[in-house]
Regions:
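Core catalytic DNA strand-manipulation module of type IA topoisomerases
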Residues: 1-313
């Protein structure tokens, strides 16, 4: 079938059937909840969820950041009154994020300030207490940096982009292509160096399309058949397992059970998920190998004796 399509397209005229362009925006990322901070710190620095919780507790006890075990990523509107003090503190520190704090537009109010979204505690943010930055441990500096950047992002404009979708017909077949051009980086300007290999959107952002109009003729440059095999699912890291625990409903087939798990935010709480992973390691059901979690013989044996309704609910 693939060979036939290549031949038919090669010997047929091709025309642009439609061109659709839309301007869009990407809103500022939200400040951190504990689990979101643990996930990002795991991806960026390789920290375990417990490492993050311990270091974050230390920052909290030093009064440099707000309550560390929060499950919320929004801020109360009255907290906006602290923005000047916080941004001024961040701007004078000798830290990678300080230049961005200095250029922040304090007139911007992002979606993060929303009283209706607040739970028992608000998102984790820097406090008005200026940290003794040089005295912080490396982990504390790195975590404070993540939290500071997420806070500073609230005072930068949304990212603006132009997305293009093109449909063309050739040989009785319809083909599509899409791309995205960034018009203004906005808050994403200081997240440019973050490596997110699994971010499909980032790949699309790098693909731009030439100017085309409906009815334009296009030339067939060539075609080839590529054979491939599906990849095995990647193993969990402590960070991705933490995310899966919070979103466990996505792995559950029973719709009623999945709905219940989604409502209660999955397995464990913000404060206990890290300790659950640690407990599994201490009991030798799983082990950390090259930054990935792998089951031990004991863990595999346990799974073999458990009923399917437990393993695959």
């Amino acid at each position: 079938v693939a060979e036939r399509i290549i031949i038919e397209v090669k010997n047929s005229p091709a025309k642009i059937s439609s061109v659709e362009q839309k301007k869009g925006t990407t809103a500022q990322r939200l400040p951190y909840s504990l689990s979101a901070l643990q996930i990002d710190a795991g991806k960026v620095f390789g920290y375990s969820p417990q490492d993050v919780l311990d270091a974050q507790q230390s920052l909290y006890e030093k009064k440099y950041t707000s309550y560390p075990r929060s499950d919320c990523d929004y801020l109360p509107e009255n907290q906006l009154a602290d923005k000047d003090a916080i941004l001024e503190n961040l701007a004078v520190l000798s830290a990678p994020f300080s230049a961005f704090a200095e250029k922040a537009d304090r007139s911007i109010k992002s979606r993060a300030w929303n009283d209706k979204k607040i739970s028992a505690h608000h998102a984790i943010i820097p406090t008005t207490v200026r940290p003794e930055y040089a005295a912080l441990s490396e982990k504390e500096k790195n975590l404070y940096g993540l939290i500071a950047r997420a806070y500073i992002a609230q005072f930068y404009p949304a990212q603006e982009f132009l997305s293009t979708k093109v449909e063309l017909s050739a040989g009785g077949e319809m083909f599509t292509a899409s791309g995205k051009v960034i018009l203004q980086q906005g808050w994403k300007s200081f997240y440019q160096n973050d490596a997110k290999k699994d971010d499909v959107e980032n790949e699309e952002e790098q693909q731009s399309l030439p100017d085309m109009q409906q009815g334009d003729s296009v030339e067939f440059a060539g075609g080839k058949i590529v054979e491939g095999v599906t990849k095995l699912p990647t193993r969990f890291t402590p960070a991705t397992l933490l995310k899966a625990m919070k979103e466990i409903h996505k792995y559950v087939h029973d719709k009623e059970l999945a709905a219940s798990l989604k409502e209660c935010s999955g397995i464990g709480t913000e404060a206990t998920r890290a300790s659950i992973i640690e407990m599994l390691q201490k009991r030798e059901y799983i082990r950390l190998e090259k930054k990935q979690l792998v089951p031990t013989d004991l863990g595999i044996s346990l799974c073999k004796i458990l009923p399917d309704k437990i393993l695959f609910p």
